[in-house]
Design a protein with these regions (language model features):
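N-terminal membrane-proximal hinge/A-helix region immediately C-terminal to the signal-anchor transmembrane segment
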Residues: 1-67, 82-94, 338, 358
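Cytochrome P450 catalytic-core helices
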Residues: 226-253, 372-390
Length: 420
């Protein structure tokens, strides 16, 4: 794909037999996502892979999406995330405490379980331990099947989800529905975004979403939070194992940090917001920024023009599919020196800017990830919990490859833990 698109700011490609304009110029991508976003709706090329409803934050309608984004924002902004840190740390500690020296672990499954536990506690608040464990197991299974779901090709073209994906979705949704029903009967016991969904109503007092739609919205939030975190953390731990010098520097930074490693938070294509008001991000955070540059979980995106637009030198009629890849944007040799190498120190002098989309691991604009601040803190905590306690190596004989499915994830990454 890189060879095909190199030197073409906009080029026509075919996806499943449908023509689309593929944009590689970061300034033009920024125009699509931010400046001219009102002229673009969500694309349909990859909708085949979706099994969730289009209510709430998945709404195709921009006004509806903005409404639910406003509902979610108070519970995911930086100040609110701080309140979730103790639970994040507890779940991270419990996850790594279950590992045994020398016994190979599926690192993506382990990170998925940790992320699912964090997501559940954030959305639902306190749950009975048995219920929480069951939800966590079902969510981890569903998230794994979602990760493996193709975005295009024959497997994605089918209108029916795979048997395993359908089974995982049905089982998790049924259990989740019972929890939502309990919260509907006692909405004051709900937490976070779920409480906002339960009490949201139109001007006539009628609930905006049905119980089923609330359940689907919860499924979407939980799976999105789980699959992306699991993928990013898997790559982070793999890269640490592959580069002892980077690992040593991360450990040194963590040793100097009493709590989470936040020294700055990369904004979705809009610059780096310093977490402490001054100075560059610390090495551990620069490492996470580099992981997200190399392996953004949402690696490809599609939009569709709602009206005729001019994009660079191209005039696009209404109904045109417009695609871009954060993976390719993040590896642009014109922006990044030696773009395929993991070099956290590049972020000492290089900062994401608001002028283009050369670094957008969480997207940008009105449909950028609403949980970005939450995700950064979660990644920091998980990285610290693992790296401080364990040294991981890739199991001998393993061949790790990137799988570009719903997320960009390592294909079956087995790692062997040894205590520090």
């Amino acid at each position: 794909m890189e060879r095909l698109l190199r030197g073409h700011p906009v080029r026509t490609v075919s996806v499943d037999g449908v023509a689309a304009e593929f944009v590689t110029d970061p300034a033009l991508v920024r125009r699509v996502l931010v400046k001219d976003d009102r002229h673009y709706g969500k694309g349909e090329l990859f909708q085949k892979a979706r099994i969730l409803s289009r209510a709430g934050l998945l709404a195709q309608d921009d006004a509806l999406h903005r409404h639910y984004r406003r509902l979610a924002h108070p519970y995911l902004r930086t100040a609110a995330v701080t309140g979730h840190v103790p639970v994040m740390e507890e779940i991270a500690r419990d996850t790594v405490a279950s590992w045994r020296p020398g016994q190979p672990i599926d690192i993506q499954a382990q990170m998925g379980r940790a992320a699912s536990g964090i997501a559940l506690s954030t959305l639902f608040g306190a749950l009975p331990r048995e219920t929480s464990d069951m939800l966590g197991e079902h969510l981890a299974a569903l998230s794994w099947e979602m990760i493996r779901k193709p975005l295009y090709g024959n497997a994605a073209r089918s209108q029916q989800p795979t048997r395993r994906l359908a089974g995982a979705f049905t089982g998790f949704r049924a259990l989740l529905a019972s929890c939502v029903a309990g919260r509907l009967n006692s909405p004051d016991t709900a937490a976070g975004y779920l409480s906002a969904l339960l009490t949201d109503a139109g001007r006539d007092g009628t609930p905006s979403l049905s119980a089923g739609q609330i359940c689907d919205e919860a499924v979407m939030m939980l799976t999105a939070a789980t699959v992306t975190t699991a993928s990013v953390m898997s790559w982070a731990l793999y890269l640490l194992a592959e580069d002892p010098l980077v690992e040593e520097k991360v450990l040194k930074d963590l040793a100097q940090t009493a709590g989470p490693v936040t020294g700055g938070v990369a904004g979705g294509g809009g610059g780096v917001r310093s977490g402490h008001g001054q100075g560059p991000p610390g090495y551990a955070l620069r490492f996470l920024m580099e992981v997200l540059r190399l392996y953004p979980p949402v690696w490809i995106t599609c939009r569709k023009t709602l009206s005729g637009v001019t994009l660079g030198e191209h005039v696009l009629p209404a109904g045109t599919h417009v695609m871009f890849s954060s993976y390719l944007l993040h590896r642009d040799p014109g922006r990044y020196r030696d773009p395929h190498r993991c070099d956290p120190d590049r972020w000492l002098s290089l900062r994401p800017t608001a002028q283009d989309a050369s670094y957008i691991p969480f997207g940008a604009g009105a449909r950028g990830c609403v949980g970005e601040a939450f995700a950064w803190r979660e990644l920091e905590i998980l990285l610290g919990a693992v790296a401080r306690e364990w040294r991981l190596t890739v199991r001998p004989g393993s061949r790790v490859r990137a799988a570009a499915h719903t997320t960009l994830h390592p294909q079956r990454l087995l790692m062997v833990p040894q205590p520090r």
